[in-house]
From Swiss-Prot:
Organism per entry: Frankia casuarinae (strain DSM 45818 / CECT 9043 / HFP020203 / CcI3)
Subunit structure: Monomer.
Entry keywords, A to Z: Carbohydrate metabolism, Glycogen biosynthesis, Glycogen metabolism, Glycosyltransferase, Transferase
Record's catalysed reaction(s): Transfers a segment of a (1->4)-alpha-D-glucan chain to a primary hydroxy group in a similar glucan chain
Compositional bias ranges of the Low complexity kind: 49-64
Polar residues: bias regions: 1-11
Lineage, opening ranks: Bacteria, Bacillati, Actinomycetota, Actinomycetes, Frankiales
Name of the protein: 1,4-alpha-glucan branching enzyme GlgB
Family to which the UniProt record says this protein belongs: Belongs to the glycosyl hydrolase 13 family. GlgB subfamily.
EC number(s) given by UniProt: 2.4.1.18
Top-rank taxon: Bacteria
Amino acid sequence: MNNGDVNNGTARTGRLATGLAPDRPNPRGAATAVRNGGGRVALADRDASSASAQPGQTADDPAVPSAPPSAPPSALPADPPAVAPAVSVDLPYDDLERLVSGAHHDPHALLGAHPHPGSDATVVRVLRPDARAVTVLVGPARYPATRLHSGGVFGVAVPGMLPDYRIEVTYPDGPYLIDDPYRHLPTLGEMDLHLIIEGRHEQLWKVLGAHPRALTTPGGATVTGVSFAVWAPSARGVRLVGDFDFWDGRAFPMRSLGRSGIWELFVPGAGTGARYKYEILGFDGIWRQKADPLAFHTEVPPATASVVFASDFTWNDGAWLDRRARTAWRTEPVSVYEVHLGSWRRGLSYRELAEELTAYVVENGFTHVEMLPVAEHPFGGSWGYQVSAYYAPTARFGSPDEFRHLVDTLHRAGIGVIVDWVPAHFPRDTWALGRFDGTPLYEHPDPRRGEQPDWGTYVFDLGRPEVRNFLVANALYWFEEFHIDGLRVDAVASMLYLDYSRPEGGWLPNIHGGRENLDAVSFLQETNATVYRRFPGAMMIAEESTAWPGVTRPTHLGGLGFGFKWNMGWMHDTLDYNSRLPIHRMYHHHQMTFSMVYAYSENFILPFSHDEVVHGKGSLLRKMPGDRWAQLANLRALLAYMWAHPGKKLLFMGCEFAQDNEWNESASLEWPLLDDPAHAGVADLVRDLNGLYRTVPALYQHDADPAGFSWIDANDAENNVFSFLRWSGEDPAGGVLACVTNFAGIGHEGYRIGLPFPGRWREILNTDGYRYGGGNIGNLGSVQAVEEPHHGLDASATLTLPPLGAIWLSPA
């Protein structure tokens, strides 16, 4: 992961003079209504001077109408105005002031259509700042409204009980015909609000965020638009800004739905592709523009607006999902190719990745891809680990449906998809989650729990039900909406320990006085249990770097409930051993054998991940000592040792062909190296390792079971040799594999090892073969085991071991 302290946001402390967002150009090139001959309106470019503009007024004046740019112009009939019922439409002055200032909790109670008490009339009130006139249209009848407040509140009474109507709003440049946003009931039901309050809404994304929809009026007319809903419980007011109101939210205050903390509004005429934000009057009295926490799409960074999006994708991966639901991955081959989409090959879109990445992964025999975080993030240098939009795949490579296409293509090719997920912390960008409603909302209010000092980020308040719900639902969202097969949860250790990376006195203990984060434990258990309940065959994977017990133990037995855990200890010990000169390795032999002491305490994945090839650590190849021949040979032996060792496999992109340079997220992998036979040989080896791994059950069937592994000789430190057997549950004669790795810089002739039974054993892998760029030192394809006990086994064979090489033997 990468968690540099990045803050790209700018606090919005007041209204802009032009009513425009600070990070986007003036959108006022949209069509504008102006008078034309015959008493009708026509469309003209908003950049042209309006015939009705006041002297000195320009198209950039804030008096430009707050109306959708797509609003159709109205006809101007010659009929005289209808006579409105003689009833009062006034409001208390305080209500009007709160309404126009954006601080009213329920603008729908004042605006829209309301039956007049004591008569059969309906009062219609409209908020349209900068409008010159407002007329309510009921069929052919026209009812001019009276200005109730200089801030743009108009009102009129019309005959009948809640008739269908539309509104004609006249601005300096002409009239617009609009539908009333304030005549509709909330789009969230009582059960939705109850579940949100309880923190148990498992499909939160279906009720919050922006949703194109069609609503029906009491008279049966259909009104299309977008419903918006956001959680901001301490806000004094929330307004909607976007392309549909020229980024001037005065005309679109939202209503609060009581103690749920949800603010909601349906905007007629808005549609897919519209950019928007919430303008929030915080508890501290400061206005801020905030991106939608549940945005499904965003602008391409560094722009920060949310984008209305509705999927119309058709999935074709039903066969894969059916197979996944029947698969127990603990006893299946899992070989993961970890990839950063932006730098695998620079410049590719999701659709291009679907073609090129899928073909590459299939060709090289991997079973899964794991993508570094794809949720939207403002700073590319964070590699995706500082997320600003948890529900939106990054727009850098295309739309959400194009990301769906990538997943669908991988599935149809038989490749599973794992995505990195970051529920531990989030960035401080002022337009994103931080201090969302003017208070610590998503983050813990106490900085000793709410801030991560190493990364300069905020930490989620996992004790708050709504925050837990936001994250649990987010995990479910990626499985349900994008058909992913697994989440790798980043930085779990930072979540589990209250004193993680904190000085003495810089952290708060739990209620028992300990350092365990009980809220995080409960959250992880809930997330894992819910995912496995709803998505059979899913994977939940922990990046957990400590010895926390029971990470992959089921939740009903007190564990965290993950399916797999990265074996960080194995990775560190193995790389440390292999970074030493062979002559010194005998003194560190235990580093390679220690992993088997705890190998069955969890369900492990062996990772050579992105974290090991950045920040000056060098590439995997450059970690190996010696000259170039020795580095390549050592890397080949190490990879074979990894594939033979108990545990699922994960290899970061570029390592499969021995990239020279350490990874750089702003550059493509060093693909020209594949023209070098030495690097092509490493690629061939990885391809063959994956092929053998998928076809030899002994290599994967009992990864988490002691019955699947036994040492031949764990103690040959003098020769730097490790030999062991892998077993499957099949007939012993065909269900065993002998793996011997020589990490010495010299070969060994006449090296005797014990084997479980006599007979011919085929050499099915030799990393020193010519095919892989080696010297072809080996055993001519097979060895003969004789009935001479050795190493506590009934038979033995004499081998030739290549320098810095590994061989695998299988009964013939």
